[in-house]
Amino acid sequence: MLNLINMEVLLFDCRSDQLVMMEEILARIGCKVSSVMKKYECFAKLMSGKYDLVIFDHGIPGLDVTGFLTEIETIDRCMSIAMMVTLPSRFYEDKYGCSGIDFLLLKPFGYNEVLLLVREAFQYSLKLRKAS
């Protein structure tokens, strides 16, 4: 069994209600959670510490997803990235291709979906760190 306790997760979303819900779920799982509502806050957090997983919402107004992902990759290539989405995964696969999104989290979601995401992201992050 994977030890998910103390897994470092950074949440980026402009909706405080969604942010609070995700924080609560991740805390129940045992993750250490940092959350931000602004892009500059997200990058400040990323520059100041290591994270195993970044979760962000596709629907953040004005967010250039491809540019955002490119910037994250320059900071840490071994970090898993998950995007919260509302449409079927095929839409995002066609739109973003190999842009660095490792996981899609389809809304609405609950504890079990987030737990599965965190488990898979943790395993993936470990593989990336071992390979680098």
Question: Which residues are covered by each model-predicted region?
Answer:
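Active-site residues of response regulator receiver
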Residues: D57-G59
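Alpha4 helix (beta4-alpha4-beta5 surface) of REC/receiver domains from two-component response regulators
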Residues: G67, L87-F103
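Acidic catalytic/metal-coordinating carboxylates
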Residues: K38, D64-G67
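A short, hydrophobic beta-strand element within the central beta-sheet of small alpha/beta folds
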Residues: C78-R90
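Two-component/phosphorelay signaling modules centered on CheY-like receiver
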Residues: R15-S34
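C-terminal output helix
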Residues: F109-R119, L126
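Short amphipathic alpha-helix used as the core "switch/output" element in two-component signaling
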Residues: T66-C78
